[in-house]
Amino acid sequence: MAVKIKLARIGKIREPHYRIVVADARTRRNGRAIETIGQYHPMEEPSRIEVDSERAQYWLGVGAQPTEPVQNILEITGDWQKFKGLPGAEGTLKTAAPKPSKQELFEAALAAAGEEPVAEATTPKKKGGKKAEAEDKAEEQKSEEGQA
């Protein structure tokens, strides 16, 4: 039985995600797989590639043939060079910079707000409820009586 390491597409339209699977060469693209050994997300920047190196080495060792896209992915992760005994087994995989946590962002915003001068609101605050309206009317009547 010929075994291939290939990409099985998952994800939405225009948002592809792929599983790196080991399957019989005769099965469909998204057909039954023997084993899933990784993931590939090409739309992220940089592309996210996760490969179980130990399982990839096993399947390459027992004769599984990678398709061209999978071979390129294995070259990026360094698994292909390790299998062939070539230099450069560390790979050229780029990883995304870690995002700052929400707590760090909040603390930075507080520090920035503490340095800026505090300004009053540009619009006056509303007085709440009917009591405030009654007080306003009473003040207006007193001011009118005082003027008369």
Swiss-Prot record:
Compositional bias of kind Basic and acidic residues: 130-148
Pfam families: Ribosomal_S16
Protein family membership: Belongs to the bacterial ribosomal protein bS16 family.
Region annotation Disordered: where it falls in the sequence: 111-148
UniProt protein name: Small ribosomal subunit protein bS16
GO cellular component, one term: cytoplasm
Keywords associated with the record: Ribonucleoprotein, Ribosomal protein
HAMAP family reported in the protein's UniProt record: Ribosomal_bS16
GO molecular function: structural constituent of ribosome
Low complexity bias (residue ranges): 111-122
Source species, domain of life: Bacteria
